[in-house]
């Protein structure tokens, strides 16, 4: 019996402890979605990139309103609005995840260490959230954007491997309920931390300077929350598979403890990497070949093709709203901070209800609705909104 088999529980599927550990990761990482993506960080970014507010008279209402005047961010000699640069930075993070996911997923399947990749992206995201506390103004705005990018890569990259565990730990009849459980954990956990952060910022902070300080502390709390609660997941989630014989004996990604020893023997890290370059090339070639093969198979089914197409437009639209709504509300509409966060909290709390009931729907009915409604209604809705 292999070492891997020894360290794995005998009953992996539908094991209550393992399923709970999987769901707890949603509790851990969902704070990024609410604190960093949707509420506190976008408002903080908008405040730090606003030069001043000027008074403008509105003749219709015969009132004076405060209009923010934004700093401009210079990139390669051109000036850009801070909100646009923020959107571009998130786009970069998604491109990184899209490019890395097929290769890393294939590599993880080959060497059987999905949990290690999940840990890597989790720690990347958590430390990046804490790194955002170093963003204090326009003088280091690129540092803030860099940590925003790496936090996004960590979050979305970890979800690739997190979601791939679902069919490994639960049978099909339990997967919907477990997925819903994860969503509920995530929604509740993120609301709890946001409330804690808001109490710090709005109640304990005295004056604008302290509010900014406690906001940065909120970023530290977000990273610590993500890192800390994920340890329960990593403790109980099994590492599937074992290292296969076809792998290079001293593969850097596996035998990282021997890197320094080989560094002395062979004259450098890059020499070690070059020894295994053919392995990485084979993995990359196989991963993208499999990606296009699966894509071709999916689009052979008419219903599935329409569903994926409509879901793509739906997902793009919703993600754009989630990522940019707060900045738009703060910078363009000049909504008050408490109204912005209050609205998002109401939406988050309302979202807890749906997963609690959706797991009880007949599975066949849900699948039928997913395949028929988006394909017929989703595209028309998208086209209607565009027009």
Say what each PLM segment does.
Residues 274, 290, 294-353:
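A single, central transmembrane helix in multi-pass transporters
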Residues 179-201:
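Glycine-rich segments within core transmembrane alpha-helices of 12-TM secondary carriers
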Residues 98, 119-139, 376-387:
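C-terminal ends and interior cores of transmembrane alpha-helices
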Residues 2-19, 238-308:
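Juxtamembrane intracellular "pre-TM" segments in multi-pass secondary transporters
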Residues 193-205, 223-243:
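C-terminal membrane-cytosol helix-exit motif in multi-pass small-molecule transporters
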Residues 99-113, 353-368:
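Helix-to-loop junctions at the C-terminal end of transmembrane segments
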């Amino acid at each position: 019996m292999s070492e891997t088999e020894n360290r794995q529980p005998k009953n992996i599927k539908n094991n209550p402890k393992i399923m709970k550990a999987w769901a707890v990761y949603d509790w851990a990482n969902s704070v990024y979605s609410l604190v960093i993506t949707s509420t506190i960080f976008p408002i903080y970014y908008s405040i730090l990139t606003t030069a001043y507010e000027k008074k403008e008279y509105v003749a219709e209402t015969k009132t004076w309103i405060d209009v923010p005047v934004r700093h401009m961010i210079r990139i390669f000699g051109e000036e850009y609005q801070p909100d646009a640069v923020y959107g571009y930075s998130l786009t970069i993070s998604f491109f990184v995840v899209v490019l890395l996911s097929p290769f890393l997923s294939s590599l993880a399947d080959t060497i059987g260490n999905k949990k290690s990749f999940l840990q890597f992206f989790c720690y990347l995201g958590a430390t990046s959230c804490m790194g955002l506390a170093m963003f204090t103004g326009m003088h280091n705005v690129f540092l803030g954007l860099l940590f925003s990018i790496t936090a996004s890569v960590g979050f979305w990259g970890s979800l690739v491997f997190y979601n791939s565990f679902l069919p490994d730990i639960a049978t099909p009849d339990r997967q919907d309920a477990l997925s819903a459980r994860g969503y509920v954990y995530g929604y509740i956990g993120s609301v709890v931390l946001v409330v804690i952060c808001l109490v710090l910022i709005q109640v304990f902070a005295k004056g604008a300077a302290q509010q900014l300080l406690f906001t940065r502390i909120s970023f530290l709390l977000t990273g610590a929350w993500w890192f800390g609660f994920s340890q329960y997941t990593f403790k109980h989630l099994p590492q599937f598979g074992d290292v296969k014989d076809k792998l290079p004996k001293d593969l850097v990604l596996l035998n990282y403890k021997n890197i320094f020893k080989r560094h002395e023997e062979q004259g450098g890290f890059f020499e070690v990497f070059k020894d295994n370059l053919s392995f990485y090339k084979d993995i990359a070639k196989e991963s993208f070949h499999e990606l296009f093969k699966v894509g071709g198979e999916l689009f052979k089914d008419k219903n599935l093709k329409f569903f994926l197409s409509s879901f793509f437009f739906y997902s793009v639209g919703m993600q754009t709203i989630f990522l940019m709504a707060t900045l738009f509300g703060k910078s363009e509409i000049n909504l008050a901070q408490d109204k912005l966060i209050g609205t998002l909290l109401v939406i988050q709390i309302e979202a807890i209800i749906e997963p609690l009931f959706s797991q009880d729907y007949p599975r066949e009915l849900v699948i039928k609705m997913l395949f028929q409604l988006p394909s017929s209604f989703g595209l028309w809705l998208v086209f209607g909104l565009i027009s």
